[in-house]
Regions:
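N-terminal binding-site loop/beta-alpha segment at the start of enzyme catalytic domains
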Residues: 1-69
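Generic beta-strand or strand-like secondary-structure segments
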Residues: 52-56, 69, 73, 91-98
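Structural motif corresponding to the early beta-alpha repeats
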Residues: 60-87
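Glycine/proline-rich, positively charged
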Residues: 79-105
Length: 105
């Protein structure tokens, strides 16, 4: 893992203009940052940071995809019901699948 990464918590949700997020990612990459950290609940609203990152990745970063390290996390409440939060196997697998879909990976 690189010594420095860019966390995308409150600066990549739907409350932020996508162009601001795009410029931030481009500048970070130009400065040598190749690790981008996400989580299933990053936004706001939850999940929107992964979705917006995925959009920018597809539109701007595909030629450099092999240079990027993209991480995400699970364990935070995402939906109602017995499998909607924390660490059950079912929750973690469902969360992983949803994160992969949102990011387009």
């Amino acid at each position: 893992m690189p010594a420095i990464s860019l966390g995308l918590w409150h600066n990549f949700g739907d409350t932020t203009l996508i162009e601001n997020s795009r410029q931030l990612l481009q500048r970070a990459f130009d400065l040598g940052i190749t690790h981008f950290d996400l989580a299933n609940n990053y936004g706001p609203p939850p999940g929107s940071a992964e979705r917006n990152f995925g959009r920018i990745l597809q539109e701007d970063f595909l030629p450099w995809r092999d240079e990027l390290i993209i991480s995400t996390k699970a364990g935070y409440t995402m939906w109602e019901g017995p499998y909607g939060d924390w660490g059950s196997r079912k929750y973690l697998l469902a969360s992983l699948d949803q994160s992969l879909k949102r990011t387009g990976l």
